[in-house]
């Protein structure tokens, strides 16, 4: 019986989903000069909580999107793709890591969390 559970968890390990993160509510009350750095930290915190991994890697395009309007004027929302992947590095502490990439959208209206087929 433990084998079946183990096999199921292995299949569920590698997954990719799209989320909309409301940065506005996460940055409420944060000083101007700390907004963009805090936004990146909050994105990492969100990804870590959702995917259950401590190793979270942010794509440079997402970082550029967050910082695009400056340190003070962070976008209200961002659409991201969270991909939980296997760590190929043999001497890594964690077996899995999460890659957070930016998904450009014209409007956030009606968007929901959706599973994405692995590329």
Curated annotation (Swiss-Prot):
**Where are the bilayer-spanning segments?**
none
Q: Which species is this UniProt entry from? A: Cyanophora paradoxa
Keyword check for Ribosomal protein: yes
GO molecular function terms here? structural constituent of ribosome
The record ties this protein, via InterPro entries, to: Ribosomal_eL31, Ribosomal_eL31_CS, Ribosomal_eL31_dom_sf
Keyword Ribosomal protein attributed: yes
Gene Ontology CC: cytosolic large ribosomal subunit
Biological process, per Gene Ontology: cytoplasmic translation
User: What PROSITE patterns does this protein map onto?
Assistant: RIBOSOMAL_L31E
Q: What family does this chain come from, according to its entry?
A: Belongs to the eukaryotic ribosomal protein eL31 family.
Q: Which UniProt keywords apply?
A: Ribonucleoprotein, Ribosomal protein
The record's listing under CDD domains reads: Ribosomal_L31e
The protein's name is Large ribosomal subunit protein eL31
Which stretches are annotated as coiled coil?
Answer: none
């Amino acid at each position: 019986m433990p084998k079946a559970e183990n096999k199921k968890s292995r299949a569920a390990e590698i997954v990719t989903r799209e989320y909309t993160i409301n940065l506005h509510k996460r940055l409420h009350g944060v000083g101007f000069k700390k907004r963009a750095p805090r936004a990146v930290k909050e994105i990492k915190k969100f990804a870590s909580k959702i995917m259950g991994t401590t190793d979270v890697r942010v794509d440079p395009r997402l970082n550029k999107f967050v910082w695009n309007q400056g340190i003070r004027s962070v976008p209200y929302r961002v659409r991201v793709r969270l991909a939980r992947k296997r760590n190929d590095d043999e001497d890594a502490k964690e077996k899995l890591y999460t890659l957070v990439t930016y998904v450009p959208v014209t409007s956030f209206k009606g968007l929901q969390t959706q599973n994405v087929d692995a590329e």
